[in-house]
Amino acid sequence: MKRIYVNEKWCLGCHLCEYECAFANSHLTDMVKALKGKAIHPKIRVEDGGDVHFAVNCRHCTDAVCVRSCISGALSFEDGMVAIDQSKCVGCLTCVLVCPFGAIMPAPEGGVAQKCMLCTDNLTGEPNCVRHCINNAIVYEERD
């Protein structure tokens, strides 16, 4: 199963992946209209640690502690990824606390959890953060 991998040595900390993620999840076709004058709410985030920058995203663990800990059954592992059904999420945010990678975060509206869902339902089949990373620090590939 393909996953997103980040090479922190190549990450410039430009945050373009965050904008592309927010745009992809806006379901609009014009980035300016989708994001102009709005706070962005990406499902990936860039952490800046001085000279080191890296993108934090869901690893889609096969034995995910977030799935096991979800009291409402909103999180599940299906088709090789951890999926979230926000209509089932009760907003306890236990998944936020137990994710060892810090990849699940509270959604700004509704008090439910949000995370990367591998937005591959586009023409290229690659997540937007990968397609638009100007330094190729984010890749979408299969590894052992």
Where are these regions (language model features)?
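Non-ligating segments of multi-cofactor redox enzymes
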Residues: 1-144
